[in-house]
Amino acid sequence: MRLLSPVTGSKLVLLFLFLGAVRSDALKLNLTDSKGTCLYAEWEMNFTITYEALKVNETVTITVPDKVTYNGSSCGDDKNGAKIMIQYGSTLSWAVNFTKEASQYFINNITLSYNTNDTKTFPGAVPKGILTVIIPVGSQLPLGVIFKCSSVLTFNLSPVVQHYWGIHLQAFVQNGTVSKHEQVCKEDKTATTVAPIIHTTVPSPTTTLTPTSIPVPTPTVGNYTISNGNATCLLATMGLQLNITEEKVPFIFNINPAITNFTGSCQPQTAQLRLNNSQIKYLDFIFAVKNEKRFYLKEVNVNMYLANGSAFHVSNNNLSFWDAPLGSSYMCNKEQVVSVSRTFQINTFNLKVQPFNVTKGEYSTAQDCSADEDNFLVPIAVGAALGGVLILVLLAYFIGLKRHHTGYEQF
């Protein structure tokens, strides 16, 4: 499928499918608890899926009807995220996750799974089985406001193009009543009509699954303190973003400190910080002492569940990050990447850590990550300076030699 830009000028936005205009029925979900409504959603969506057949790639558009099941949907609370889950028979399942932070909440990931064993929907498909695409959305919305968007919102993550429109959404509803205050999407503010338009052609095959056009928010910074008896022995402050590429499907997950537990331990030569929440069974950061003078991040272990329910675990005990002298802390305010394995990396933001020799529960003087860059640049600068001096000496020598030779000829 190739997506064309909306019609310019009048900005008309209409939705045309392969054989003409088709309208799907709106999906509606009103979850309640003891106070009343706790999650409200109404929207329409369809998916255009390219799948591998015997000799060529085929394309099918699935328009989701209103008669679906919502098993697994939940309202969430301050510690647990909200979730909308949809099942369309055995052909398709869809889910979106929400997390709450202070006075706002985030639409985290959209997960779509489709079953190519359904020969009616996917005739001639090879291979057969359940395939999953995960889109990290990262949209941020205020609490106490209903989000509305009549225009089409398109997520193009090969081999699936997803379209959403006619959206009315409020997660973490307060006081049991859907809000009358609205937040309208920017697409509606610039469009003169709200019916979505897409022109479709058969797409060229691709294996790229990286959602390069989808912004991911910066993670919230968390503070983690580990004690040994009555004394603080480990301090860590950082925003954490987990980047997973499993079977070419990207998964980006921001750790929310508000719903994350942590434990740890301190030994003379090693220290451990362990994080866990409803999705992460454990995420370990293990520090070690090097040459009795410095500390560094030696090991990272992770065991967690992806949005599609599959387990993911990676360990690496041969790392060398966040190196600093004992008695000091390590700090890096800019984004830094810890590559744990080919399929797993951790992006850190506003990092500060001290796993040894903590005094009075406070950070010691920090070694900044920019010092590492300075240490790298110093030899280059010294070498360049020496090279410049050598060039000047050679120039002076040749100039002197030329003058001496000229004087000899005149004599």
UniProtKB/Swiss-Prot annotation:
PTM notes: Extensively N-glycosylated. Contains a minor proportion of O-linked glycans. Contains sialylated glycans.
Keyword Magnesium assigned: no
Residues passing through the membrane, by range: 377-400
Cellular localisation: Lysosome membrane; Endosome membrane; Cell membrane; Cytoplasmic vesicle, Autophagosome membrane
A Pfam family hit: Lamp2_2nd
Chief subcellular location: membrane
Secretion signal span: 1-26
A single GO cellular-component term on record: late endosome membrane
Gene Ontology biological-process entries: autophagosome maturation; autophagy; cellular response to starvation; chaperone-mediated autophagy; lysosomal lumen acidification; lysosomal protein catabolic process; muscle cell cellular homeostasis; protein stabilization
Function: Lysosomal membrane glycoprotein which plays an important role in lysosome biogenesis, lysosomal pH regulation and autophagy. Acts as an important regulator of lysosomal lumen pH regulation by acting as a direct inhibitor of the proton channel TMEM175, facilitating lysosomal acidification for optimal hydrolase activity. Plays an important role in chaperone-mediated autophagy, a process that mediates lysosomal degradation of proteins in response to various stresses and as part of the normal turnover of proteins with a long biological half-live.
Important for binding and subsequent lysosomal degradation of target proteins as annotated region, ranges: 402-405
Record-linked InterPro entries: Lamp2-like_luminal, Lamp2-like_TM, LAMP_CS, Lysosome-assoc_membr_glycop
Subunit structure: Monomer. Forms large homooligomers. Interacts (via its cytoplasmic region) with HSPA8; HSPA8 mediates recruitment of proteins with a KFERQ motif to the surface of the lysosome for chaperone-mediated autophagy. Interacts with HSP90 in the lysosome lumen; this enhances LAMP2 stability. Interacts with MLLT11. Interacts with ABCB9. Interacts with FURIN. Interacts with CT55; this interaction may be important for LAMP2 protein stability. Interacts with TMEM175; inhibiting the proton channel activity of TMEM175.
Keywords: Autophagy, Cell membrane, Cytoplasmic vesicle, Disulfide bond, Endosome, Glycoprotein, Lysosome, Membrane, Signal, Transmembrane, Transmembrane helix
Annotated S-S bridges: C38-C75, C149-C185, C233-C266, C332-C369
Sites carrying sugar chains: 46, 57, 71, 97, 109, 117, 175, 223, 230, 243, 261, 276, 308, 318, 357
Chain spans, region Hinge: 189-229
Region described as First lumenal domain: 27-188
Protein name per its UniProtKB record: Lysosome-associated membrane glycoprotein 2
Single GO MF annotation: ion channel inhibitor activity
Phylogenetic lineage: Eukaryota, Metazoa, Chordata, Craniata, Vertebrata
Gene3D superfamilies to which the protein is assigned, alphabetical: 2.40.160.110
Membrane topology label: Single-pass type I membrane protein
Lumenal side: 27-376
Residues in the Cytoplasmic compartment per record: 401-411
Family from the record: Belongs to the LAMP family.
